[in-house]
Amino acid sequence: MKIGVLTFHAAMNVGAQLQALALFKTLKDAGHEVEFIRYEPNYLKYPYRFFRNARIKNGIVSYVKQCLLHIFCDTYTWIKTKRHYGDFQERFYTLSRRVYKNPDELAKAVYDAIITGSDQVWNPEITNGNLDPMYTLHFQSDRIRKISYAASFSEKHIDRNMAEELVGRIKSFYAVSVREECLKKYFDNLSQLHIEVVLDPTLLLTKSQWLALMPEKRMIKERYVLLYQARGIKKDVLKQATDLADKLHATVYDASGMNYRVAKYGKQYVSPIEFLNLVFFAEAVVTVSFHGTALSLVLEKPFFSICLNDGRDGRVINLLKGMGLSSQLKPVGEELAVPRMDYSLARRHLDTARTASLSFLFKALN
């Protein structure tokens, strides 16, 4: 089949890029002709804001200094990151020749199927306050099979009217899946639609498949603990990683990005492939990130996933609970012991979940 995929494939975010790659590779390895549909809404083009961390409470002079620091540091980092991600996309992706601007254009596209997801493609907080009709495949077509794979949204950011509107749109889908159990329950309370819960695409690929994509040579020669925070920089988490590194006679390497204040611990920007390398060769991983957790899991690395208790820990908690690894969840500030992990049980759980998720995907395309 010729398949178009609508996701946040151009987002300059390690998780977004690697999950897009994983879904692309899974479909392509199954013999399908696959490309990412180029859709470039303004709300995704430039996610970084120069003044987002500046504070005026310390006086106008301090505020101006902070703004200037953000302008120069964020701009430099954004340019470097854009280049890294552009190289990654050119190497691994196939993109549609044309840029699509509305659902009517999609209805005329020469695809046998269009898959929307993974990622929070149905989250109005991300899609400019509304359900984006592109990501909900809001068009009429008897020719194109509509499928969602691991699509997501936040219950906190969608009201009942909008949820009912979403249900109305996905009624025309051939197959629907979401990536969180809570979202399936949410839909079950609103409709009679058959909805399945599937793995995030990063977990569809095996350890050997991920390793085949990255260079064998390690980036960092010395022993290190990898720190990756995707929900803002928390000094307490940095301290947890630093203390753990001391126990392991290692240094801390921070791959969080966009954070010049702790640049001495690492780089401000890494490519998605570099990130894989950093995870695989780390003595341990300390992360506040679903994808940091997922990749540590699939690469079978010692790790700790730090919970911020901000209402956004659910995905990680559910994932690790399902894998029998809840012991790797730790609150902010708690001392981290040297991790000693046995992956034998988690490996079996992951294999079972992967088989079910691939079954959903391939059945939807057959």
Regions found by a protein language model. Give the residues of each.
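Active-site anion-handling motifs in enzyme catalytic cores
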Residues: 1-366
